[in-house]
Amino acid sequence: MDYKEKTCKELITLCKQLNIKGYTKKNKNEIITLLQEVKEVKEVKEVKEVKEVKEVKEVKEANTIHLKPIIKWSGGKADEIKYFEHHIPSNYNIYLEPFIGGGALYFYSNPKNAVISDVHSELIDLYSIIGQGKSNEIYKFMEQTPNNEEMYYNVRDNMVINNPLTNAQRFYYQRKTCFRGMLRYNKNGKFNIPFGRYKTINYEALNNKDYETLLSRTQILCKSFEYIFENYNDENNFMFLDPPYDSEFTDYGYCQFGKKEQEKLAKLFKETKIKCLMVIGKTTFIQELYKDYIVDEYDKNYRFKLYDGRVGDEINTKHLVIKNY
């Protein structure tokens, strides 16, 4: 609207409609200045309101897309979310997961603001590469690399790793082709799981842009759990904890996690301001560590396929649901 073409009387009428006061009736320039200022304020307010509505819409849309883990991970919780989902806070600022692993709850929740971390550098390179929009490079590698025993051991033992992309490519290939998706390293830090003998492997998730969208808006770190507790200690944040279980096996090849680490984690869990939800295997030691924080437990039955094709005996365990809020 060009105010200069209006008469003083018309401008005064506009001022009255907009409830503008403090002008001189005979000073046309003063009235025009006031009207322009009000218009600018109104436009800024409208832009802000549109932005806020858009942000709320994005969050709602994001949370309706439940993704599945990209890779297999020992102890993954994809089939168990139904047992503890109702304990998750309805509102929080940042989703935190310091033992991301396969990230079952993270991908399922599809949070708008998240920080995920793990001390496993190959895993972090994989998530980072996908978040950077380079999943097509991993897809090409999968297409060009045969799923056979000779190639598997060549990739596992001889592939030259000189950057995060080649690291991610090898890691993803191994996760898809190794026996039972297991993760184990020898004393020299070399991956030592045998070939899986799968007739077909599915890597189409790499073409799903929803993974890239989620990971691109996530801060992806290769840090210890202590670092996450220390740097995101806010009561408005939510942390999901799926740590290594309390067992005789404590050396994962890429990290050590025994009784000492479990005790350190429990101490941080009890002292932090962060709303923490943990799911972990039930043992006497864990029960004692978290005796005042256990809110639920459920049964989990495992049955593993053996390397010769036979199916092993069913293993019955219990998982504890623990929270500090």
Residue ranges, per PLM feature:
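Long, positively charged, glycine-interspersed low-complexity recognition regions
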Residues: 258-325
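SAM-dependent nucleic-acid methyltransferase catalytic core
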Residues: 58-80, 86, 131-240, 244-250, ...
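Short loop/helix-cap segments at secondary-structure boundaries that form the rim of catalytic
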Residues: 106-111, 212, 231-234, 286-292
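Short, polar loop motifs at secondary-structure junctions
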Residues: 99-104, 206-207, 280-284
